[in-house]
Amino acid sequence: LPETLVPLTFSGNAGVTIPAGERLQSDAAAFPVEKGTAIAVSLYFAEFTEMRSGVVITGPLSGGYFAVGDQTANAVLDTDTSKKTHTVYFLSDIDVLTAAENRTLICFGDSITAQAWPDYLMERTLQCGDGTTAVIRKAASGTRILRQYDNITYDSYGLKGETRFPREIQVAGADTVLIQHGINDIIHPVGTDVNRFRPWSDLPTAAEMIEGLRFYIRTARASGLRVYMGTLLPIEGWRTYADIREKLRSEVNQWIRTTDEIDGCVDFDRAVCDPEHPTAFAAGYDSGDHLHPSLTAYARMAEEVPEALLRNEESH
């Protein structure tokens, strides 16, 4: 609605130049936020702007539009000159001044977390939580824990988790992080005879992956966060599936299920796998690529998160 449009400023200025690789925070804005309502943030680029980074978010609560011209003051877009998109540029956080008892749960991961389960978790929080918890997604498709690509072909996959994680958990009001990350470390390496940018030497051992997850734990603890981890999902049928990858996934999952170094395991794998054939998704839970879950499976993943995580309780 036109009456809800609030311009943002940066040190009092209507526009801002963001240095490459840097973060900027806008001035505070007087804008009422109601629990469970959507917020639209409009950006205008007066000149051609080459997008070198961004993230694709495809959950049901997420999305936006491209449009021609300066539409920032318009409450409605012309459907003939606009296009729906799931790509998010520049915006990483919206901080809200709220009551002290309110808290934030961070969902950290890759393309699986960039898709629907955090959205369904937010919906579940609104339905059965105590109204104090916000769910924040920190996800980048294609990312790995231990390595990142240094070539134009795969630069869009972004930074490795060991670089991303310390920065991305700096979220206002956060007290818990739920990590579901690591499957790309397992499925990406194929050998330089197949893909020059994906050597077999990139395939980690289970011990190396676990040490990467331990880095997450140490970093989160240093920021005062509780740490929950989700198991890695089935991959049988994915184009690079092999016994060596399944063995690695199984070993990492076994550690996640049994370690006493975290506050709890959310067993996403068992929630969506075929109980008769646990290396594959259960019927109706595969999106079709044998790597990403279906929307039904994402909803099931959200159900697997303990209800205690959706409430502000002293002990989870």
List each model region and its residues:
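Non-catalytic positions within long, well-ordered alpha-helices that form the structural scaffold/packing
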Residues: 170, 221, 257-258
